[in-house]
Regions:
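Alpha-helical scaffold segments in soluble metabolic enzymes
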Residues: 35, 87-90, 115, 138, ...
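Gly/Ser/Thr-rich active-site loops/lids in small-molecule metabolic enzymes
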Residues: 37, 173-177, 260
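Active-site glycine-rich loop that binds ribose-phosphate moieties when present
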Residues: 131-135, 171-179, 217-221
Length: 291
């Protein structure tokens, strides 16, 4: 069967239960959708239910169906890793054998932080594995007073830099991320991504991350299906952070989004566009706003 257009939509970080290797990453029991359903006393998602979403697990309020209107299945990663790049690259046929370096338990080495501070002219606070919302409550007011960078990591291979847009200009934040990316090209610190995490707000409990996030990723180490599609003369439209994840490799057109709703509205608009190929969409709010 041949399709002129394919829409691949990734609900970033919206998991339906832990994977087979969850214990390896201390993620056993993870189930974002299941927990949302429980806290909200069930979800009313009739369209997804008819497609067969309820058949993927036990989700309160979402019934299973005997005749789903779509093909449904669960996937487990074959790659060695669990971060954004590893997962998205594997979707496009690129299996990662050697996981990216993580600093979850230790934070980044002093040598790395010292070099970053010297090159950017600002001190750092944080340097721990932490939720992106929690770290702002911990250090947001401190940054307003001092102008220090808030840096942190996670279970993923990332160096994240948070900056209040009213204190540190966006361009300075982006430049600092480029500096961090250059430093982190050293094999001993080679993380998968450096991420700019701008936010606004003035006091604990009222900080909000903005849509001006930007990822500085390593390029895929080999060709992906995106390259094959592009080389075949087909359209490859990256929506949201997809172009960042692949460092524009194999992408023919980029569409920026500011939220999940904006991402879906732009995807709906694309349905009226007479392109021929793939629209690859990432809905990032589950991670960027709530992660």
């Amino acid at each position: 069967m041949k399709f002129n257009r394919i829409f691949l939509i990734v609900c970033d970080s919206m998991g339906i239960g832990n994977a087979k290797d969850a214990k390896k990453y201390n993620d056993f029991g993870a189930n974002t959708v299941g927990h949302i359903c429980s806290i909200c006393d069930g979800l009313n998602i009739p369209t997804l239910q008819n497609l067969g979403f309820g058949n993927l697990g036990d989700f309160k309020g979402v019934a299973k169906t005997q005749n789903p209107q779509a093909y449904i299945l669960k996937l487990n990663e074959a790659s060695n890793g669990k971060d954004t790049m590893t997962g998205h690259w594997e979707m496009m046929g690129l299996k990662t054998e050697k996981p990216f370096i993580t600093f979850t338990d230790t934070g980044f080495p002093k040598e790395f932080i010292d070099l970053f501070e010297k090159k950017t002219g600002r001190k750092c606070v944080g340097n721990i594995a932490c939720s992106g919302t929690k770290i702002l409550d911990m250090y947001g007011e401190h940054q307003i007073k001092t102008g220090d960078w808030i840096v942190y990591t996670s279970a993923d291979s990332v160096f994240q830099i948070a900056a209040n847009e009213d204190i540190i200009p966006l361009e300075e934040l982006y430049h600092a991320c480029q500096i961090a990316r250059e430093i982190a090209m050293d094999d001993k610190w080679k993380v998968g991504r450096v991420i700019a995490r701008p936010y606004i707000g003035t006091k604990e409990g009222h900080f909000t991350r903005t849509s001006n996030r930007h990822d500085y990723a390593l390029a895929p180490f080999s060709k992906t299906a995106l390259d094959s599609l592009k080389d075949a003369g087909l359209d490859v439209i990256g929506v949201g952070k997809i172009p960042d994840i692949f460092v524009d490799q194999g992408i023919t057109r980029k569409i920026k989004t500011v939220s999940n709703e904006d991402g879906m509205n732009k995807t709906i608009e694309l349905a009226s566009d007479n392109f021929n190929g793939l629209a690859f969409i990432n809905l990032v709010d589950f991670d960027a706003v709530y992660g």
